[in-house]
């Protein structure tokens, strides 16, 4: 048997995609041997796929105010925010509410 995998979908909307190489949807296969929380995922994203101005996406160890996070269409605040443990086929959507004038 191979290494267990955790497959999830990341989506970026309303300008958040500009920080990730203008890619709006990304299917990820993560190492299923480890526990993946949103906190771990954000660190992985910063190290691997965040291409532009990380200060517009992250503030310390979390997303900055103005970035909405939905997990399977549910506000992450209802699911434990950074402590939420990712499940197979989760859809994590990041929506930027930060817009210039």
Curated annotation (Swiss-Prot):
Protein's name according to its UniProt entry: Ubiquitin-related modifier 1 homolog
Modified residues (1-thioglycine): 101
Compartmental location: Cytoplasm
Biochemical pathway: tRNA modification; 5-methoxycarbonylmethyl-2-thiouridine-tRNA biosynthesis
Gene it is expressed from: Urm1
Record-linked PANTHER family: RURM1 PROTEIN
Organism: Drosophila simulans
Similarity remark: Belongs to the URM1 family.
HAMAP family: Urm1
Oligomer status and interactors: Interacts with cer.
């Amino acid at each position: 048997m191979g290494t267990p995998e955790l497959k999830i979908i990341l989506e970026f909307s309303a300008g958040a995609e500009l920080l990730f190489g203008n890619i709006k949807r990304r299917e990820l296969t993560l190492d299923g041997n480890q526990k993946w929380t949103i906190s771990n995922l954000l660190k992985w994203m910063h190290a691997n796929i965040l291409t532009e101005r990380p200060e517009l996406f992250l503030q310390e160890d979390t997303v900055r105010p103005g970035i909405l996070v939905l997990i399977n269409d549910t506000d992450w605040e209802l699911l434990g925010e950074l402590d939420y443990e990712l499940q197979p086929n989760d859809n994590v959507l990041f929506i930027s509410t930060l817009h210039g004038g």
